Curated annotation (Swiss-Prot):
Gene Ontology terms: cellular component: cytoplasm; DNA-directed RNA polymerase complex
InterPro entries the record matches: RNAP_P/RPABC4 (IPR006591), RPABC4/Spt4 (IPR029040), Rpo12 (IPR023464)
Transmembrane portions of the chain: none
Top enzyme category: transferase
Pfam hit, one: Zn_ribbon_RPAB4
Top-level taxon: Archaea
Alphabetical UniProt keywords: Cytoplasm, DNA-directed RNA polymerase, Metal-binding, Nucleotidyltransferase, Transcription, Transferase, Zinc
Name the record gives this protein: DNA-directed RNA polymerase subunit Rpo12
Function: DNA-dependent RNA polymerase (RNAP) catalyzes the transcription of DNA into RNA using the four ribonucleoside triphosphates as substrates.
Main location: cytoplasm
GO molecular function, one term: DNA-directed RNA polymerase activity
EC number(s) given by UniProt: 2.7.7.6
Length: 44
C-alpha cells in the first residue's frame, strides 16, 4: 500500500508489521494516496 508522509512529502511503502512511521523523517502521520482511476457517473 502506498502512502505519503505529511511532513517530508515522500512516498512510503508500508509492510504489514513494519509499524506506521516514515522511514525518512520518523513522522507518524501518513496520508493514503488516492487512486488515479477516472470514474464515470451518469447524470439525469
Amino acid at each position: 500500500m502506498s502512502y505519503k508522509c505529511s511532513r517530508c512529502k515522500r512516498d512510503v511503502e508500508l509492510d504489514e508489521y513494519g509499524g506506521v512511521r516514515c522511514p525518512y523523517c520518523g513522522h507518524r502521520v501518513l496520508l493514503k494516496e488516492r487512486s488515479r482511476d477516472v470514474k464515470e457517473v451518469s447524470v439525469q
